[in-house]
Curated annotation (Swiss-Prot):
Belongs to the PARI family. Signal peptide: none annotated. This is PCNA-interacting partner. Required to suppress inappropriate homologous recombination, thereby playing a central role DNA repair and in the maintenance of genomic stability. Antagonizes homologous recombination by interfering with the formation of the RAD51-DNA homologous recombination structure. Binds single-strand DNA and poly(A) homopolymers. Positively regulate the poly(ADP-ribosyl)ation activity of PARP1; however such function may be indirect. Interacts with RAD51 and PCNA. Interacts with PARP1. Interacts with TASOR.
Amino acid sequence: MAGLNQKSILDMIKEFRRNWHTLCNSERTTVCGADSMLLALQLSMAENNKQHSGEFTVSLSDIILTWKYFLHEKLNLPVENIKVIDHYEDIRKIYDDFLKNSNMLDLIDVYKKCSDLTSNCENYANISPSRLLDFLSGREYAVDDETDFSEPVSPMSKHNQENEKVQLLAKKIIYSYLNLLVNSKNDLALAHILNIPDRGLGREAFTDLKHAAREKQMSIFLVATSFIRTIELGGKGYAPSPSDPLRAHIKGLSNFINFIDKLDEILGEVSNPSIAGGRILSVIKMQLIKGQNSRDPFYKAVEEVAQDLDLRIKNIINSQQGDVALSTTDISPARPKSHTINHGTAYCGRDTVKALLVLLDEEAASAPTKNKAELLYDNENTIHPNGTSVLTLFRCRSPTQVDNSPMKPLRERIYKSMEEKKIKMKQTSIRSQFACTYKDDCMISKDKWNNVNSASEPLCVLHMENDLSEGVNSSVGRPTIGTSSGNVHLGRSEKEKVARKSSSLTGNTSSKRKQVDLDDENILCDNGNEPLQHKIVKIPKTSKDLQNKLDGKLLRVAKSNRCTTKDKLITGQTKLTQFFRL
């Protein structure tokens, strides 16, 4: 009876696969078996408890009680005598969202979807809600289990039980790799294999991946893949932030993603599904037994499981080819050219994916685990050193609980953000080979801020210093320099020297600049304590062009002097002023 029921469930799943385009959104949607349904319910209940009580945990008794009510409620069976747990609606919503985000359907969803197909319902008419309930709850195998309790436990039986546990673990790991290869959104499968073999990706790495997946609303595997692709191909401009917590796990994540890429390459490059399936299993097996002792039970279990699955894949492919041959006897062998092109390019590896889906469906239709406590709470590190239970992996602190220190002041937060921007700009900026002759951007910005905030040296002083290179006071108390009257004069000897030099070098641009600079050195300012009045600067007769340029420079000096508010004399200027006043 048990075998018949399991075969009927497998036929139901096959019917679902034939009509996947009308029943689901993706061909790679995987079916969630009884054990995976119970694990998903456990995580949903723990998440609900965390939202209401703050602790990501749930007791075994509550899970068993909720599991019983969940099966009756979802199969539309009477639930009068079953106690319902608090917040069941929230738990059910979390469960449905988890399966939807993981691109999975449980056996009850498959049964309901197939029930809507009225044309082919006779293929699984022997499946009723009550029988499906008995299968999922394990009642179909209760009679077989009664004989086991009467037998005494011997050392040999204990040894056999340990070997069976190791073999089940190896089987679960290999199936999880195949499941993730087919369905990249399956977070439950990723939790089983993220750190097997050891990649340094423990609870902390899984917690960081989970937080990033929630922020980006993506699956954990896609978040890890996106992060590694950004590191490898993005460049400095698109590199993740230096404070990204995933940077601490680059080595392990890169190892994991590259291994999955290797499996994807085999899936896409090898057209023969039988050969591709064998190579995929061989690569997974070599990865798991690398560095292991050949006498280790886990080593032997991995080899046995890989060999068994390889044989099952070959049988599945042979049966599929036989079904295709029978179904196409009355169809013309001529195919459109587009059909050939699509199957040769875009759908490369599709036959292998179909074979792997059948293998995963057979596992989903298998009987549930007898020991629920061992399934839900037993840490896998008792068998494998890097194994951790799923509940332990998903139990993590929220991002708000990572740092319990009080919020920093606004000034410190602004300063920190500005420093991060400066670091990022320095990393991405392209500098010239002569950049050493210029000031850094941060120094220039600092000088600008100092000039703006300084009350004693306004910005107009900078313009004066650019106009007059030497000898001009940049902080005279608002004088107006003109040509009509004043009390500043040039010495006779100096005037004769300037006249001779300007007359001999007329027309030379560099000489004109020297002449202007020499004239500027002799422009002296009075004491700022004197009352405001017009000043005069007597200039020797020179060429007309030189005179116009000098007048324009003096006017600019006059405008800039209006902005000054304080006297500031250079060294020796007082003596020169007294000398020329004589």
